[in-house]
Regions:
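Domain-level detector of nuclease and nuclease-like folds
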Residues: 2-150
Length: 150
């Protein structure tokens, strides 16, 4: 079973740990997913896990924040699937870290993900970083268009 640490900081939540197994080990807490963010939750938000349920992340509120559905189901899920594919190879050691930037208790403004894969046989290492604004793809495209118009 994977072990992750969860931390609340003045700038948001951080979760990290080694991914050694793939596959959920506890039932989803759909209630926590529905209440994540409270009054700050927006209409198109999901209760998104910092560490994915499929990577054995906790179903507790320490691991769930309101997250735009595009970010949750497309952007972050893409990275989670990459991490899972690396972790399924027993020759790999996979460290995974996710930070949601915002004061705790509010809707995150951004998600930052880092992961590192080390092949135990060859020593080869892969380091990846991604960050996402916690807004819909349509709104982000609009921002880009406004930047290029000016």
């Amino acid at each position: 079973m994977n072990k992750f640490t969860y931390e609340n900081t003045p700038l948001g939540k951080i979760a990290s740990g080694y991914v050694e197994e793939v596959g959920a080990v506890e039932p989803r807490n759909t209630y926590n997913q529905k209440i994540a963010g409270g009054e700050y939750r927006q209409e198109n938000d999901h209760g998104g896990h910092l560490i994915a349920h499929s990577l054995q992340g906790s179903s507790g509120l320490e691991n769930i924040d309101p997250q735009n559905k595009n970010v949750n189901q497309i952007d972050q899920r893409h990275i989670e699937r990459e991490v899972a594919s690396y972790a399924q190879d027993s020759n790999n050691s996979v460290f995974y870290s996710v930070a949601n930037y915002t004061p705790v208790g509010e809707r995150p403004q951004a998600t930052m993900i880092n992961y590192s894969v080390t092949n135990k046989l060859t020593g080869e290492q892969i380091n990846e970083y991604a960050s996402f604004q916690n807004e819909s793809h349509a709104l982000q495209e609009q921002w880009s268009e406004e930047v290029y118009e000016n």
